Design a protein with these regions (language model features):
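Positively charged n-region of N-terminal signal peptides that target proteins for export
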Residues: 1-3
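Short alpha-helical "patches" and their helix-cap loops
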Residues: 5-7, 79
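Bacterial N-terminal signal peptides
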Residues: 7-15
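Periplasmic c-type cytochrome electron-transfer domains
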Residues: 17-312
Length: 312
């Protein structure tokens, strides 16, 4: 039976680039009706210990937490990230995949759909846990097998979701971010362009560190992740007549690619200058984004109509 479910799920799954938490990808690989407008237009406020002023490790971990590049196999192809199941550190109660979930907010993480090597032959969806206050725990995971947050994080990436072995810096960053998630009640807010652009500025601020330290590998890794987040925004401007907004976002992505290329060539002054220029452009974006916003998929009614159309 599990093999049949796996075959149906894989047959329905599009092959997507490993970019950000993909709106298009999520709508295509989830069965119709599984993903609600509510889940796509509202999320809990993040509320980090210490506010928005965080160390590089926390900011890099925050970016990685939202990047499908952390995962592998089906999850990465579908554009999923840690954020998909743990929105801003809370349990995503609307997450649901028929055949893998017993109810909204649950998922079978030991299924071949995610990792052939992790298949246990048992239908055992688990309730998605909140990561709030995780730094105070002495055991991790619903089975409490992991003795440290670092061990638990690695297991999720490698064993459950077939990701590549994370290096020490990446694990340090992911742990640092999770340890800043305060144990508070969820307060919901709209998913907004304003917040997404503010997040981009935070990612670009963090990117200044590897450029200042002249670390080309880390700079390239971060630019790939940030370009993915721009791709997420790009999907919200879905109409063909939004060429101005779409073109602007594509140009920002190209500028990041050039920064990575300059870093790879050791052109550090040029890379740092280009990053400063890009930060200024995003801090004061052209009016075209605001003009197109009422017709974008940030608007719940527009999104509802878009979801109801046949899968593209």
């Amino acid at each position: 039976m599990r093999r049949l479910v796996l075959g149906v799920l894989l047959a329905a799954l599009p092959v997507l680039a490993a970019q950000a938490q993909s709106l298009v990808g999520a709508l295509e690989w989830l069965p119709p009706g599984s993903l609600s407008v509510e889940a796509l237009t509202r999320h809990p406020q993040e509320q980090l210990e210490g506010g928005e002023k965080q160390s590089f490790y926390v900011e890099f971990g925050r970016l990685a937490f939202r990047s499908p590049d952390m995962l592998g196999g089906t999850a990465r192809k579908a554009g999923l990230s840690c954020q998909a199941c743990h929105a801003n550190g809370f349990a995503t109660t609307a997450f649901f995949i028929p055949g893998l979930s017993s109810k909204p907010g649950s998922i079978d993480v030991s299924h071949a759909f995610w990792n052939l090597r992790g298949e246990d032959g048992i239908e055992n969806p688990l309730e998605i846990p909140s990561l709030r206050g995780v730094k105070t725990k002495d055991r991790f995971g619903l089975d409490r097998r992991a003795a440290s947050l670092r061990e638990f994080t690695r297991r999720v990436i490698v064993t459950e979701f077939s990701g590549a072995e994370p290096d020490a810096l990446l694990l340090d960053a992911l742990v640092a971010y999770q340890e800043k998630l305060q144990p508070v009640a969820a307060v919901y807010e709209p998913v907004s362009l304003q917040q997404d652009l503010a997040d981009l500025m935070r990612y670009l601020d963090a990117l200044r560190v590897p450029l200042a330290e002249e670390e080309p590998v880390l700079a390239e890794r971060m630019t790939v992740m940030i370009r993915g987040q721009i791709g997420f925004i790009h999907e919200r401007f879905a109409d063909d007549d939004m060429r101005g907004s779409r073109g602007l976002l594509e140009e920002w992505s190209r500028q990041l690619a050039r920064i990575a290329e300059q870093a790879g060539k050791g052109q550090w002054v040029q890379a740092r200058t280009a990053l400063a220029d890009l930060r200024q452009a995003i801090a004061t974006p052209p009016a075209v984004l605001a003009a197109d916003l009422p017709r974008s998929l940030y608007e719940p009614e527009r999104l509802k109509s878009w979801i109801s159309k046949p899968v593209r």
